[in-house]
Amino acid sequence: MVKNKIFKSIIILSLILLSTSVVTACGKKADKASSSAASEQGSASSGAVSVEVPPMSSNGIMYGVIIEASEKHMTLQSDMGTTVRFGLNKDVDVTGLKDGIAAGEAVKVEYKGELKGESAKKVKVNKVSDSEKLPQLSKEALVAAGSIILAVRNKDQSSLARLCEYPLVFDTGTDRRIGSVQEFISLKKSDVFTKRLVSSVSKTNLFVTNSYSDGFLLGLSEPNLVVSSTKDGYLITGFHYK
């Protein structure tokens, strides 16, 4: 009787141990499968993150005053004090321009592409319209200012000479008078187009250039140019280097 009980106990214990082994083995297989799936999912996620999205062309807006215009190009003196030359295609929308693309017009330029500094080689102009914000100077004054800025930027002494009224004040610390176009052209180029003068005039923001009684100043500060209203239009009446 006792022997039978002992034998039954041994059988029951063996069955318990066997079932435990099976459960443990299944658990290990499930863990391995789960780890493998997680690893594969992680790899897939890592792959998705590493995919590079190609850069998209940017859209931009620039405000400025047109200082030079032709059928295929226009040069803008922007409200940031930069001079940018844009190419113009036949499909440019100009329906928002009252007087067309012309020197002295304050405009808003909508473009697509990459604008690097003053270079617009990779830019396509989509639309040119009248600017909502307006300069304080008259259109006649803006046309004159644009011609002067271009002559100074290009260091074109001959053109600049013809944008002056004589006798002309040429103040380099000593008050000097220049009597004629020929005398102005005979001046040393380095004396006329100093680095500081070219920088000051070229960075003029025509939207904030103030007019006074009979003219305006071109330049961020000294050195600057005094531009006055004369019987022959707006002309430079003074160069002030100090």
List PLM regions with ranges.
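Short, flexible, surface-exposed loop segments at domain boundaries
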Residues: 2, 7, 15, 19-20, ...
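Glycine-centered tight beta-turn/hairpin loop motif at sheet-sheet or coil-to-beta transitions
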Residues: 59, 79-81, 220-222
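Exposed beta-sheet edge and beta->alpha loop/turn motif
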Residues: 63, 185-242
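A short macromolecule-binding patch
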Residues: 81-91
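Short alpha-helix capping/helix-loop boundary micro-motifs
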Residues: 91-97
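Short solvent-exposed beta->alpha transition segments
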Residues: 103, 142-143, 159-211
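Short, low-complexity N-terminal intrinsically disordered segments enriched in polar/charged residues
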Residues: 126-150
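Short helix-adjacent coil turns
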Residues: 147-159
